Amino acid sequence: MLLTAEFWVAVAFVAFLVIVWRVGGFSMMTNGLDSRAKRVRNELDEARRLREEAAAVLADYKRRRTEAEREAEAIISGAREDAERIAAEGHARLNDFVARRTKSAEAKIAQAEAQASAQVRAAAADAAVKVSETLLRERLQGAAAQDLLRASLGDVKSRLQA
């Protein structure tokens, strides 16, 4: 048993462990592992902090985007209301303009009708006077006829034009 290779490997391994322990190798290994664990823990803490910071930035971005969307919607609805109001005002102004033009045209037509009617009456009166004058001239003779004719024609003319 003392001469087997496994025995001497075991003795050498135990001797190696004793030497490593004496030199402080175990404490160096544990210190190295502890420092590595500490560094990993710090990196995890930093990653957690960065993740929380990113989540806060994302939440802020979402809040700002929501506010911007609300503001844009308010601007759009305001613009729509303004456009509708302006269109309604335009329609009202157009309707007023058309009504004024119609009223003006109707007044001009009524004035033209009245003027035409007066001209027709005047022309009819003149024609009636001329016809009457011609008939009376042919039928009545003398100075008395002329005086009667003038008086009658003046009377007829004034009555027809009134």
From Swiss-Prot:
InterPro entries, from UniProt? ATP_synth_b/b'su_bac/chlpt, ATP_synthase_B_chain
Query: What name does this protein carry?
Result: ATP synthase subunit b 1
Report keywords, A-Z: ATP synthesis, Cell inner membrane, Cell membrane, CF(0), Hydrogen ion transport, Ion transport, Membrane, Transmembrane, Transmembrane helix, Transport
The record's subcellular locations are: Cell inner membrane
Database matches in Pfam families: ATP-synt_B
Corresponding gene?
Answer: atpF1
> What are the recorded GO MF terms, alphabetically?
proton-transporting ATP synthase activity, rotational mechanism; proton-transporting ATPase activity, rotational mechanism
The UniProt entry, under CDD domains, shows: ATP-synt_Fo_b
* Top-level lineage group: Bacteria
Q: Which HAMAP family match?
A: ATP_synth_b_bprime (MF_01398)
The membrane topology noted for this protein in its Swiss-Prot or TrEMBL record is: Single-pass membrane protein
Cellular component GO terms, alphabetical: plasma membrane; proton-transporting ATP synthase complex
